[in-house]
């Protein structure tokens, strides 16, 4: 990212659980609006900022077969993974570009829709990022945002080590300059970025991990994050957890995965901004 701004604070190596995400389970607030836009303008241009593994980008592209999606991220490695995913799904109306959300390499008023999912919560200056997304969006276009509220996890059973893991995620993201309460702050950020209240539609949506398949996508990734990699190293370095505590958290995620009635719900703030 640009000098003076923090990067994605959890690292890029352990993002397998991101590939569970789709337009349907992670950008559902945008879909009715997108379908209306596609009907009126089949060849629309959509920018996906911080696309990561590209699963949402590819599923959005299916809703606009005559349009074009530009998927961006600051990691060439993750963009290569996103391109491979799109190719595997037969999605051809998508291109990939390394880009920094604070300095998007596009002219003013380029895109009909600008989309960002779980991007602002990792940034130290989310309002500046929204301003930049609004800049590249056409007048009358839509900026779509969805951000987790890290404080709003509902986990069962309440295994003590998992409750500690939840608090650790908050400490890690906020300790690196991110936004633990991003979901509930979207309206405030959008207003500060210059949008008028009547041009902002706010909602809240959830993720639910309760089926064996969904739980595996999340729980296995959190177990791995506890055992190895960048997130573990940073947690220890920042003094937020010890190695032994992280090992206990990994065991707790294994227990959660093996428990038939376990579940996890996470609240997300959602905003649609009309650019004027």
Segments predicted by a language model, with ranges:
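Conserved alpha-helix/loop element of class I SAM-dependent methyltransferases that forms part
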Residues: 19-44, 59
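Class I SAM-dependent methyltransferase SAM/SAH-binding core
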Residues: 37, 44-49, 53-103, 128
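Conserved catalytic/acceptor-binding region of the Class I
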Residues: 144-225
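Class I SAM-dependent methyltransferase Rossmann-like catalytic core
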Residues: 1-24
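C-terminal helical/coil "lid" or tail adjacent to the Rossmann-like core of SAM-dependent
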Residues: 2-9, 167, 199-264
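A short glycine-rich, Lys/Arg-flanked "PGG" loop and its adjoining helix->strand segment in the class I
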Residues: 127-142
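A short SAM/SAH-binding and catalytic strip from SAM-dependent methyltransferases
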Residues: 112-126
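A short acidic, Gly/Pro-enriched loop at the edge of an enzyme's catalytic core
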Residues: 102-113
């Amino acid at each position: 990212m640009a000098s003076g701004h923090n990067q994605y604070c959890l690292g890029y190596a352990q993002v397998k659980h991101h590939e569970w995400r789709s337009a349907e389970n992670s950008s559902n607030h945008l879909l009715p609006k997108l379908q209306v836009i596609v009907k009126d303008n089949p060849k629309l241009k959509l920018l996906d900022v911080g696309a990561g593994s590209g699963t949402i980008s590819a599923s959005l592209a299916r809703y606009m077969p005559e349009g074009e999606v530009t998927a961006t991220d600051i990691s060439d490695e993750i963009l290569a993974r996103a391109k491979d995913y799109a190719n595997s799904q037969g999605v051809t109306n998508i291109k990939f570009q390394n880009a920094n959300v604070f300095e998007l390499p596009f002219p003013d008023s380029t895109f009909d829709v600008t989309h960002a999912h779980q991007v602002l919560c990792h940034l130290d200056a989310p309002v500046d990022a929204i301003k930049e997304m609004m800049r590249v969006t056409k007048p009358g276009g839509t900026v779509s945002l969805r951000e987790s509220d890290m404080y709003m996890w509902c986990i069962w059973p309440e295994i003590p080590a998992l409750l500690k893991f939840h608090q650790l995620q908050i400490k890690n993201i906020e300790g690196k300059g991110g936004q633990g309460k991003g979901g509930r702050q979207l309206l405030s950020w959008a207003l500060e970025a210059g949008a008028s209240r009547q041009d902002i539609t706010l909602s809240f949506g959830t993720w639910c991990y309760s089926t064996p398949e969904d739980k595996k996508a999340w729980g296995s990734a959190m177990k791995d994050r506890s055992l190895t990699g960048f997130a573990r190293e940073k947690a220890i370095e920042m003094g937020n957890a010890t190695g032994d505590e992280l090992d206990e958290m990994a065991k707790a995620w294994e227990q959660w995965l093996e428990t038939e009635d376990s579940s996890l719900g996470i609240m997300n703030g959602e905003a649609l901004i009309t650019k004027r």
